[in-house]
Amino acid sequence: MKASLALLSLLTAFTSHSLKSPAVPPTVVQIQANTNLAIADGARQQIGSTLFYDPAYVQLTYPGGDVPQERGVCSDVVIRALRSQKVDLQKLVHEDMAKNFAEYPQKWKLKRPDSNIDHRRVPNLETWFSRHDKTRPTSKNPSDYQAGDIVSWRLDNGLAHIGVVSDGFARDGTPLVIHNIGAGAQEEDVLFNWRMVGHYRYFVK
């Protein structure tokens, strides 16, 4: 009797194991560096780690300076996404402003560049992207926007805003946007929510 029970237990265990689906390893997608898709991925990495919107002026190291990862403003999403591809907008904007200060918006009553804040101001980023041939046409056609593109708007209250086009899509096919408008880095369907004033593509592909 004991032998029969042991055999039955063994058969049950074998059958149960045989019916289980084999483990399928997760698909690993290799994203090529220095591409616009890599910029989108750099923005995505901020979701869940950048949790607050904080516009405080902060003394930064230079180059490569940043505020604490858990906080920032809309421009920090763009800065960090590009920095993931070893593109330092703090350095690039500061160097260009040092040589061409009059070409940048004169909205903050400054007489010289400030590497702590200049690259974190959306109008300065818009100017830098335009001056360095990164501009793309603005349109209402979702297919004109690729993952990793950078888009800027003027909100209904007139404030400047900027974000990174995601590789995700809304149900109607509109590309999602990764941005920080008040609650940290979020991926949302906002591409056409406000008046678009800038569309930029950093890498050729």
UniProtKB/Swiss-Prot annotation:
Alphabetically list the UniProt keywords.
Signal
Q: Which Pfam families match?
A: DUF1287 (PF06940)
Signal peptide as annotated in the record: 1-18
InterPro entries reported for this sequence: DUF1287
State whether keyword Signal applies.
yes
**What name does UniProt use for this protein?**
Uncharacterized protein YijF
Species this chain originates from:
Escherichia coli (strain K12)
**The encoding gene:** yijF
